[in-house]
Amino acid sequence: MYRSHTCGELRPAHAGQEVTLAGWVHRRRDHGDLIFIDLRDRYGITQVVFNSAHPTAHEVAETVRSEYVLQVRGKVRIRPPEAVNPDLATGEIELEASEAQVLNPARTPPIYIAKEGGEDESVRLKYRYLDLRRERMQRNLILRHRVVKFIRDFLDAEGFLEIETPILIKSTPEGARDYLVPSRLHPGKFYALPQSPQQLKQLLMVAGYDKYFQIARCFRDEDQRADRQPEFTQLDMEMSFVDQDDVLDLIERMFTALCRTVVPHKHLPTPFRRLSYAEAMERYGSDKPDLRYGLELVNLSDLLIETPFQVFRNVLNSGGQVKGIRAPGCAHFSRKQIDELTDVVRAGGAKGLAWAVLPTDGGEVRSSFAKNLAPGEFAAIVERMQAEAGDLLLIVADQPAVVAASLDKLRRNLAERLQLADPNTLCFAWIVDFPLVEWNEDEQRWDAVHHPFTAPKDEDMHLLATDPGKVRAKAYDLILNGYEAGGGSIRIHRRDVQQQIFSLLGISEEQAQAQFGHMLEAFEYGAPPHGGIAPGIDRLVMILADEPTIREVMAFPKTQQAVDLMTNAPSPVDERQLKELHIRIVMPE
């Protein structure tokens, strides 16, 4: 037996007991006759005391260094009051060592384990097995385990079945590029790794498994924008004989109970707000707004139709918008800060930023545009934006998509500057009534906003043939603190409707049969009404753990270039393997 207890287990009630611990040397302090070692495992830290009364153990303690793997036997004793460490769960006791054995020595680690070292992330990823020893990483992975376990227990109690679906599937054009796997047994043919189990879970509904879930691994060969990973984990769910409210109510109950169990210190407003897609875009410029703060967009377009200011007027005459954000109490912002905000909206596509400062002393307004307005127009803007002395008004004029993108960036930037987003608040909300399709100007065709299996709203079905851009979907996104936490929809369950949507998306009958024939045929054998959702596990745990990226809550993540620095994947393979697969590599020129 290597250990009788863990390093986080011993308490004053164990005083006088002979115990055996095993773990890593966290810290070592040598005072000659006395050597103190903090012994660590994932459960905690115990202080071990080596003294010359036990010379063999003391000699071992003289040789060990940080991260040695050590086994220690000794007697638990109460620490003197002045030596109690309130920062440790075991801080009231210590272990007086009588025997010690080095189970494995260790080289000097390239990163600090006992504290955050500030090293480059690439070093952490290369030595991930060392980085994972750190308290922060252990805390995150334990939280992840608790989240997944809670979900499994909750859904089991709700009558769901956890069913595994294949990893090797058929390649179909669902969105991002597939990861392809060549078939040795069928030369020239390929499997794909699933971007999601979307079609398979719908087929499970056809099969009669009315409540399905899976902690599903998903793969997308896409450009690694911002905080993405080529492989990720989602809670995949599907239910039969449900409408949108049934799905939303279940998920809301689950996430409310989850958060109150695993992060009880966080504030969780309930019930979750519900906003239509149109309302979210109008008020926040985003379909995943952070609702922990205000800074809502204010539409000024109708006030400025006849304005003599040509910048605003030309935009409005070309179908654009004029919208602004009131930054309360920000009249003190310097010109340098306003220039920085201008760069923020330019990153969203805007050509510039109009601004006005309402001084606190009742003095003259400073503005980049007010002097160009007609009498009364600036006063109308101030009234519409409910501005007060000491406020800063920030306005963008452009086409609606640019106004939304740029003011969304501005809103988030202001919230960060003003520290408006409470990290201890979890603000969930539902975004509903998405458009079913959007026009792809480059390809001159309609694209599905979510995926081609999303059902249109019944009351909009008549518009499919005449005005598809106005058709709303039975789709919904769960958002959390400015992130999309999960997306779902009620699905199409009739072959004729599915074929109509394929046709709208420019998928011919031949293509539909080749790519989705199994789905279309299944719908002819009694497919029930069904719907589901797929919240992302990585993103959820990242937010609950107050981490900046999903890499901090994954055991072995890849870089933004999809490289595993620890194992050097991807890597070349043996020529023999390529021959077996009938593959020849043609390098790009």
From Swiss-Prot:
One annotated Gene Ontology cellular component of this protein? cytoplasm
Predominant location:
cytoplasm
Its transmembrane ranges are none
**Which domain of life, per UniProt?**
Bacteria
Pfam families in alphabetical order: GAD, tRNA-synt_2, tRNA_anti-codon
Q: Where is this site: Important for tRNA non-discrimination?
A: H31
Q: Does the keyword 4Fe-4S apply?
A: no
- What keywords were assigned to this record? Aminoacyl-tRNA synthetase, ATP-binding, Cytoplasm, Ligase, Nucleotide-binding, Protein biosynthesis
EC number of this enzyme = 6.1.1.23
Annotated InterPro entries: Aa-tRNA-synt_II, aa-tRNA-synth_II, aa-tRNA-synth_II/BPL/LPL, Asp-tRNA-ligase_1, Asp-tRNA-ligase_1_N, Asp/Asn-tRNA-synth_IIb, AspRS_core, GAD-like_sf
Residues recorded as binding L-aspartate, renumbered to this chain, are: E174, R220, H450, R491
Q: Which reaction does it catalyse?
A: tRNA(Asx) + L-aspartate + ATP = L-aspartyl-tRNA(Asx) + AMP + diphosphate
Which HAMAP family does this one have? Asp_tRNA_synth_type1 (MF_00044)
What is the purpose of this protein?
A: Aspartyl-tRNA synthetase with relaxed tRNA specificity since it is able to aspartylate not only its cognate tRNA(Asp) but also tRNA(Asn). Reaction proceeds in two steps: L-aspartate is first activated by ATP to form Asp-AMP and then transferred to the acceptor end of tRNA(Asp/Asn).
Name the family. Answer: Belongs to the class-II aminoacyl-tRNA synthetase family. Type 1 subfamily.
How would you summarize the oligomeric state and partners of this protein?
Answer: Homodimer.
Can you say what this protein is called?
Aspartate--tRNA(Asp/Asn) ligase
**Species, as recorded:** Chloroflexus aurantiacus (strain ATCC 29364 / DSM 637 / Y-400-fl)
